[in-house]
Curated annotation (Swiss-Prot):
GO terms for molecular function: phosphorelay response regulator activity; transcription cis-regulatory region binding. SUPFAM superfamilies: C-terminal effector domain of the bipartite response regulators, CheY-like. Phosphorylated by WalK. SMART domains: REC (SM00448), Trans_reg_C (SM00862). PANTHER family: PHOSPHATE REGULON TRANSCRIPTIONAL REGULATORY PROTEIN PHOB, REGULATOR OF RPOS. Keywords: Activator, Cytoplasm, DNA-binding, Phosphoprotein, Transcription, Transcription regulation, Two-component regulatory system. Residues 132-231 bind DNA. It comes from Staphylococcus haemolyticus (strain JCSC1435). This is Transcriptional regulatory protein WalR. Member of the two-component regulatory system WalK/WalR. The keyword Signal does not apply. Pfam families: Response_reg, Trans_reg_C. One of its GO terms (cellular component) is protein-DNA complex.
Length: 233
């Protein structure tokens, strides 16, 4: 069965070009041209991936991303004419998986679509989640086979990537991992983003698992090097 792609862009010529080229690659493609229609379309079609422009009439891309993330975990690639670091970081914090700055190469964008689909829907690598045994860290329990974690018996909702990152750190307890290493290992060698993606995902994780994210007890920063998961007796 063909993968479903939703393209959201208020510039119809761009949406048409993307639709044409994605269909040539064998994808089923659905288009929306404003934020409100985009949310309705995504909820109706439940696509495998979304290409989402930031500048949209109605709701902007950031609002659409936030709304979609309330229910869905499919990869979201942000399309933006802004080459601003704050836009990229904000998009990632809201749950986007990747971003492309306009003007972009259609070939490059399709490569990113394929890479994001492959990473998100393929079986996790053995190194990241090969065990089915529960892992307990203080009051957190990781269930690798169920792709879930609990803290003090309560479920903590993590995205696919957040879980993989936390699980990988748990398998290397106390070892400092550089951002570059985490990007290559958890996101994959074909990921097009930069190490800021790791920082954003760590920040989201801390907000979900730490009692006080500003004074983390689990995921600790080694300044100038990277991150590690603190051991607890």
């Amino acid at each position: 069965m063909a993968r479903k792609v939703v393209v959201v862009d208020d510039e119809k010529p761009i949406a048409d070009i993307l639709e044409f080229n994605l269909k040539k690659e064998g994808y089923d493609v659905y288009c929306a041209y404003d934020g409100n229609d985009a949310v309705d379309l995504i909820y109706e079609e439940e696509p495998d991936i979304v290409l989402l422009d930031i500048m949209l009439p109605g709701r902007d891309g950031m609002e659409v991303c936030r709304e979609v993330r309330k229910k869905f975990e499919m990869p979201i690639i942000m399309l933006t004419a802004k080459d601003s670091e704050i836009d990229k970081v904000l998009g990632l914090e809201l749950g986007a998986d990747d971003y492309v700055t306009k003007p972009f190469s259609t070939r490059e964008l399709i490569a990113r679509v394929k890479a994001n689909l492959r990473r998100h829907y393929s079986q996790p690598a053995q190194e990241v989640s090969g065990t089915t045994n529960e892992i307990t860290i203080k009051d957190i329990v990781i269930y690798p086979d169920a792709y879930s974690i609990k803290k003090r018996g309560e479920d903590i909702e993590l995205t696919h990537r957040e879980f993989e990152l936390f699980h990988y750190l748990s398998k290397h307890m106390g070892q400092v991992m550089t951002r570059e290493h985490l990007l290559q290992t958890v996101w994959g060698y074909d990921y097009f983003g930069d190490v800021r993606t790791v920082d954003v995902t760590i920040r989201r994780l801390r907000e979900k698992i730490e009692d006080d994210p500003s004074h983390p007890e689990y995921i600790v920063t080694r300044r100038g090097v990277g991150y590690f998961l603190q051991q607890h007796d």
